[in-house]
Amino acid sequence: MKLFIGLIFCSLVMGVSSDGWFSFFKEAVQGASDLWRAYWDMKEANYQNSGRYFRARGNYEAAQRGPGGIWAAKIISNVGEYFQGLLQYLGSSSEREEDQVSNRRAEEWGRSGQDPDHFRPAGLPKKY
């Protein structure tokens, strides 16, 4: 636990720009909110093969907030990936490795500022 907290703190220090701590944390909270909204929309849409689009969209919107949003998107994506790996280790997950790689690619695509519609499945309602 101490190691985890230390890693979080170090990544915070490395991620803070000259804009200051307040704006960084504000961006991080807003970025986390963007990821949550994308996750909620994915669950609400319940549309086949739309997961990569929503992952890219959430990371894209978070990255638009600034360095804090990018940091939050990376942390949340990594925690989700580690949790998924733990579930696979315990035998509780059926997600394949190629799906994980594809999801990671979609998240990085969004964080880099590229258009998340690249992953948008045909027929997904315009609401999303």
Curated annotation (Swiss-Prot):
GO cellular component: extracellular region
Keywords noted in UniProt: Secreted, Signal
InterPro entries found in the cross-reference section: Serum_amyloid_A, Synovial_Prolif_Regulator
Pfam families: SAA
Biased composition (Basic and acidic residues): 99-120
Signal peptide: 1-18
SMART domains according to UniProt: SAA (SM00197)
Region spans: Disordered: 93-128
Cell compartment(s), UniProt: Secreted
Keyword RNA-binding: no
Family: Belongs to the SAA family.
Complexes and interactors: Apolipoprotein of the HDL complex.
PANTHER family: SERUM AMYLOID A (PTHR23424), SERUM AMYLOID A PROTEIN (PTHR23424:SF29)
Its job: Major acute phase reactant.
Annotated protein name in UniProt: Serum amyloid A-4 protein
Species whose genome carries this gene: Sus scrofa (Pig)
